[in-house]
Amino acid sequence: MRKQTRFKFNAFMSRLAELNGVDTGDLDKKFSVEPSVTQTIMTRVQDSSSFLTRINIVPVPEMKAEKIGLDVSGTIASNTDTAGGDERETADFATLDAEGYFCQQVNYDFHIRYNTLDLWARYQDFQTRLRDAIVKRQALDRIMIGFNGTHRAKTSNRVKFPLLQDIAPGWLQKYRENAPSRVMNKVVAEDGSVVSEKLRVGAGGDYANLDALVMDATNNLIAPWYQEDPELVVICGRQLLADKYFPLVNQEQPNTEAMAADLIISQKRIGNLPAVRVPYFPADALLITRMDNLSIYWQEDTHRRHMVENSKRDRIENYESINEDYVVEDYACGALVENIELLPAKPTDPQTKAALTSSGEDIKTLAGAIVEAVKAAAAPAEPVADVEVKGPEEAPVDDKVKGGK
């Protein structure tokens, strides 16, 4: 470590000790992070990701208890015939299911090599860069666990489970375990027999396109009082969005059609719902829900940390842990669709291709007519010359009518 790096790193360590109320020499021993510091760190973790800013990251006092829940679950309006002796009954404003939450320890341990610190020491914001690097990685790991976690291993294996599947059950796994009736992963007939082990999307498949699949899942798997919720979104990965919009851009287009394609792609909608692309989401799945239906609970006073300078390996080691859990607030406000198979597009036969070409020409003609109409409507009106308006010419009066003989 260079002299300048040592000076800036020591300043970072001094600041860390000051914030947590410990001596600088005790940072290599495990200490409890001050609650205010933990809150600040968790806020920075949330703010570092556009996705995390839209979900809940909530401190809870207990390791295990009931969930906080959404603002309102279900309906509360009712009628009661009190004159007939019936009593009015209140509805639970925020129904809590029996699952609850269970915060368990998750480690966020890492090391930074001396040569990396030497590079960062060239900048005036050395401490900010070091802090932000830690915060960003923790944020990405939490997203990865939330969408890929399936179980909790006593000792995790990053080589065997590169997507952190063995750290903790994530949101998708919670749906599989606690609300299987709201998970669609195969096609089942009315008699219960399995028609297809996959959800085939495309020509000749179970659904013509992703829009139909999302609409079907919304109508059949989500509770009726949530189906019309304007905050519902479709959470998915990059690949599904690419497969949906690729045909729009994989062709030569006139400027007008290219602009229309850009507009459609920029809106990013699936099944008439906004599509939200998040990192590390499974490529063959999508989750329909409100963003605030997903939460990360972290237990207060469980944030532990210590930093060690391991000169034998030319690096600084940071050991950090906190108790946390991934929570779905209300399973009725969501549906998980997975095991999606996108079928390859079938080649267009000559007759259909000719019809499509003809249809395309009609559309271009219509588009041109609309453009001309808009131009005409936008153009200033030309002044109209004054014209004497004459009434209908009077018929000649017969002399006899005048009284002539």
List each language-model region with its residue ranges.
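Intrinsically disordered or highly flexible coil/loop and linker segments, enriched in small
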Residues: 22, 26, 51, 139-147, ...
